[in-house]
Amino acid sequence: AGAVIPGWAAIEELGGVDTVQVDADELFTADSVNLEDIRIFKGGRIDRAILYAASILNQSCETLRGLFRQISEDRTDILSPVKDLETPYGLGFAAWGDNNRVLIGNRAYMEKEGVPVPETEYEEEHSQHGTLQILYLAVSGNLHAMFVLRSTGGRNAARGLEVLQKENIRLLVTCKDPSLTARHITDAYHLPEGMVTLLEQDQCDALNAAPAQPE
């Protein structure tokens, strides 16, 4: 069995390694996520949806913070104060803002919290059958918006991943962005199917508990 090496450090000297572990923040920078579409649901308002999302993501998600800061023209002064931030891994974020409980996350998170979501066919259509990322926003238990996103790979990470691909080394990814899947990472960097695994919470815990590799 090969070792799990965290990060890009000494990537050219990976003798005997079969797996590298990185965080999604190392694959996608704050300016690599694009907003493709916003769908607003009954009772929602586009300006409020963007403000809620920007306020929470500014404190909780590196890869999405840049996008929503850009949409709000970097006006951090207009962001709502956020209280009691929760970050259930792989699902999304919850917080109190403007006296409302706000949830931002994927379909699984909305369903877990009892928020009604559109039919899967609607999501499939707007995500172009899973090619694009979907991020839902709910306020006080009601679905307000669906953000449709696309992440673009970066040049530096692409070079590192090319080395891994040549050596048949798999990539384990920890990720706070609930809209990202292994497929999105694979597509963004044109990697072979099966090379990328998005880690679950218990796998992250096991990695953190594992003894560090000797220098």
What are these regions (language model features)?
Residues A1-I11, R69, R75-I78, I185, ...:
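Juxtamembrane coupling segments of multi-pass membrane pumps/enzymes
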